[in-house]
């Protein structure tokens, strides 16, 4: 298993603080940009941090839990949206082009035969997971295969920033079950509308999650993150866990998107707590439970925009702020270089 080292470095942290504080501005006046500059500097081990060739991987897979009527959309939307990604017509395509972010699309386990397709990375573990209301979503072997596939994909990314996106009808239910199993919070605090369920649908979804977590109580009680992942997760979530671990091992900046991506991070952080040093929480989703997830992980979201689309859209929308953070650190004048007087003692 991968070992992720903490970015903590007292000497470099002091150098970064001095560099930031000596820019031509009042102390702390760039707010969260200063926090990001320090974090990225510690990740990259330099006071001259930069963003190089950012990339985002969208992982798609289907979920057996849809048999419990937990989504407002049919399962076929998963493969139809993959086709939309490949055609360049989804929101993530638009935002990735706008922000010069390389986009990779992965079939992690969609219930559809795509054949050989340009632009689609075939890592299909199976044609969707099993129904975790009745049995574990995947076998331990399938879970390990998916995690390893994610690691291998992240190993091949060229840049130093990696974001994660997902597509899978039913995956907010899987993420909510992971959240409840990991935090022991009531299902009502973990379950939201997903793709747009009405109030009665949300109540039904809460019961499905509550009952499923209770059904697998013996597994949940062990608090073993990979067992929880195999029991409730999707193949896309498992691949994201692996990709996160490998990206952090490579000292990349990890852009964390919404509810499903953060559920994967909960698993990864239980395996390797230092991974959180590498994570930028791009936004706080409107999906119920995401704020609690972020708080549980000690994170602070960059954006608050009411997003709940997924696909990695929030991560790519936060990219300009990462550029701004490293650019002011490298390019902004100091009081000395600009011959500007500092504040009175």
Curated annotation (Swiss-Prot):
Keywords: Cobalamin biosynthesis, Glycosyltransferase, Transferase
Domain of life: Bacteria
Presence of keyword Glycosyltransferase: yes
InterPro entries attached to this UniProt entry: Nict_dMeBzImd_PRibTrfase, Nict_dMeBzImd_PRibTrfase_bact, Nict_dMeBzImd_PRibTrfase_N, Nict_dMeBzImd_PRibTrfase_sf
Presence of keyword Cytoplasm: no
Catalytic activity field: 5,6-dimethylbenzimidazole + nicotinate beta-D-ribonucleotide = alpha-ribazole 5'-phosphate + nicotinate + H(+)
Residues annotated as the enzyme's active site: 311
GO molecular function: nicotinate-nucleotide-dimethylbenzimidazole phosphoribosyltransferase activity
Function: Catalyzes the synthesis of alpha-ribazole-5'-phosphate from nicotinate mononucleotide (NAMN) and 5,6-dimethylbenzimidazole (DMB).
Family from the record: Belongs to the CobT family.
Protein name as annotated: Nicotinate-nucleotide--dimethylbenzimidazole phosphoribosyltransferase
Gene (name only): cobT
């Amino acid at each position: 298993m991968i070992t992720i080292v903490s970015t903590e470095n007292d000497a470099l942290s002091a150098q970064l603080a001095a560099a930031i504080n000596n820019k031509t501005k009042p102390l702390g006046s760039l707010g969260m940009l200063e926090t990001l500059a320090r974090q990225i500097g510690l990740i990259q081990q330099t006071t001259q941090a930069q963003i190089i060739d950012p990339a985002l991987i969208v992982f798609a897979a289907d979920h057996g839990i849809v048999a419990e009527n937990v989504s407002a959309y049919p399962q076929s939307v998963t493969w139809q949206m993959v086709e939309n990604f490949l055609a360049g017509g989804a929101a993530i395509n638009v935002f990735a082009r706008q922000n010069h972010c390389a986009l990779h699309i992965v079939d992690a386990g969609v219930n559809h035969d795509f054949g050989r397709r340009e632009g689609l990375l075939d890592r299909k573990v199976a044609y969707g997971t099993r129904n975790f209301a009745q049995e574990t979503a995947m076998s331990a072997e399938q879970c390990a295969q998916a995690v390893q596939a994610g690691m291998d994909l992240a190993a091949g990314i060229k840049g130093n920033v990696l974001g994660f996106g997902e597509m899978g009808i039913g995956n907010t239910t899987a993420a909510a079950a992971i959240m409840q199993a990991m935090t022991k919070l009531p299902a009502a605090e973990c379950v939201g509308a997903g793709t747009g369920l009405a109030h009665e649908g949300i109540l039904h979804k809460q019961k499905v999650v509550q009952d499923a977590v209770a059904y697998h109580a013996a597994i949940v009680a062990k608090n073993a993150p990979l067992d929880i992942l195999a029991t409730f997760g999707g193949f896309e979530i498992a691949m994201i866990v692996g990709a996160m671990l490998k990206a952090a091992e490579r000292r990349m900046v990890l852009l964390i998107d919404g509810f499903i991506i953060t559920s994967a991070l909960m698993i990864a952080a239980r395996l390797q707590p230092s991974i959180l040093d590498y994570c930028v929480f791009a936004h706080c989703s409107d999906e119920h439970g995401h704020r609690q997830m972020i708080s549980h992980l000690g994170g602070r979201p960059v954006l608050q925009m009411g997003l709940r689309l997924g696909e990695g859209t929030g991560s790519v929308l936060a990219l300009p702020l990462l550029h701004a953070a490293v650019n002011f650190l490298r390019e902004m004048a100091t009081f000395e270089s600009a011959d500007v007087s500092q504040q009175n003692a």
